[in-house]
Amino acid sequence: MARVVVITGGGTGIGAACARLMHPAGERVFITGRRDAVRAVANETGATALVAMPPTARCGASGCCRRSSTRPAGLMSSSAAPAGWATAPPPRPATANEREALDGNLTSAFASVRACLPSLIARRGNVLFVASIASLAAGPQACGYVTAKHALIGLMRSVARDYGPQGVRANAICPGWVTTPMADEEMHPLMQAEGLSLTEAYQRVCRDVPLRRPASPEEIAQACQFLCSPQAAIISGATLVADGGASIVDVPTLAFA
């Protein structure tokens, strides 16, 4: 019997790549998101699409899990690129931008897990949180995003700790730069300031990454597929870093490179 997989934020980037990879592999895939691109990916892959309006994709996940025929064995709560976004730090706490960052990157994941948890327990399923290297370090001008991403790792560990005895696994993947539409937008200020092409901008931000390049959405999707698969049955509470080696760089020594 095919497993049922719910992917939040499945319309673009990593989420869309996961849908394209998992549906042909025999999984029964449901994708949710806030944009009409979700329907396009569903038409392309044969997945079932549910479009939820802002502020989060949690309604879509709830809709999937309420269907009697949709008892997911896997929930991919994608908050790094598909169902999440970064904003500049607000001038004072609790502004709309800060709340938007927390809603899009943390609250949506909480709600998605809560909606699907009964089915995950019944099926001894697993949850994969698509986090970010912002879960492990702080980038500039991204206070709300960094805060939410750090908290996402805590949520993953709590799910793994509390529901492991009932057979539920929870893990997180932390990508670095990935060539997604959201990351493309983040390149625009650098492109405008320095007259760079999109490719050159990615080369610039990855110049100190050991592999010297960003990941493709497909590369991250392959790692996601493994963590959700039976081959990873003993892996729970883990954080897989998929950043080309960026997080191992000793920044103070870069001047000597």
Swiss-Prot record:
Task: Give coiled-coil spans as residue ranges.
Answer: none
Q: InterPro entries per the record?
A: NAD(P)-bd_dom_sf, Sc_DH/Rdtase_CS, SDR, SDR_fam
Q: Which UniProt keywords apply?
A: Oxidoreductase
What SUPFAM superfamilies does the record tag this protein with? NAD(P)-binding Rossmann-fold domains
Record-stated family: Belongs to the short-chain dehydrogenases/reductases (SDR) family.
Q: What does it do?
A: Might catalyze the conversion of monoamine compounds or their metabolites.
Q: What is this protein called?
A: Protein MoaE
**Gene behind the chain:** moaE
